[in-house]
């Protein structure tokens, strides 16, 4: 009976990491899957690849296999294999061989290593108004179930009622321990990670912990000053526009930004001057009077003389 070269079967090197081996396994499993492949030996090759993956995907069994491979030319190793000459074997058989050659440690190899389940990550959309206070949210996701070959066999729909804390930010990750896929051989479950995505708002832009809102003003409101009702995340407030306000000017409204555990941001009102529609004769006359009264004003004086 010959010890199979699992690395050659997978087309990888003994020094390759698990990620590389897993990639090779998935490629070969798809290639030789009996339901897909038309090759005459597809089923046998598929079983051989699955057998190699069963050993190389387990850290402890891979280490034992590597040790067996290093001793494959030892007399004791050869005697053990000659006893089984002509017999078929699978990935489990080398556990017995390892035990007979290396003693008690080989017997312990039957106790498969506990493996932690996979983490799952889902995106949760949150409105700006919802960040002001803790709120409950029902989320649904699919829990993948893996077969013995490490491929997703099916998915189980799952629903949870979770609490989204106040002050969550865009891209923040919330961990729900043990809500991922089940562990193997007594290993712990994976976790569910909620990745917060703050939905775009029609009025507010986020700047770190602060908010910005564009406040449209008529030219005379900017020139003379005004009191304007400005929306915040909770309610409208009356904002005083100082006389002579300029387009792009930012007026600070304290404590009306985003909320966090350590700090509450501010709301900045960014002034935008909006011209009225095409003026009639009376409005044109008024604009002309203003132009005559301010004839010395040059809005482009900073350009200097051409």
UniProtKB/Swiss-Prot annotation:
Coiled coil segments of this chain: none
A Pfam family matched in the record: DnaJ_C
InterPro entries: DNA-bd_curved-DNA, DnaJ_C, DnaJ_domain, DnaJ_domain_CS, HSP40/DnaJ_pept-bd, J_dom_sf
GO-annotated molecular function: bent DNA binding; unfolded protein binding
Domain of life: Bacteria
A single BP term in Gene Ontology: chaperone cofactor-dependent protein refolding
Keywords of the record: Chaperone, Cytoplasm, DNA-binding
Spans through the membrane: none
Role: DNA-binding protein that preferentially recognizes a curved DNA sequence. It is probably a functional analog of DnaJ; displays overlapping activities with DnaJ, but functions under different conditions, probably acting as a molecular chaperone in an adaptive response to environmental stresses other than heat shock. Lacks autonomous chaperone activity; binds native substrates and targets them for recognition by DnaK. Its activity is inhibited by the binding of CbpM.
PANTHER family: DNAJ HOMOLOG 1, MITOCHONDRIAL-RELATED
Protein name, UniProt field: Curved DNA-binding protein
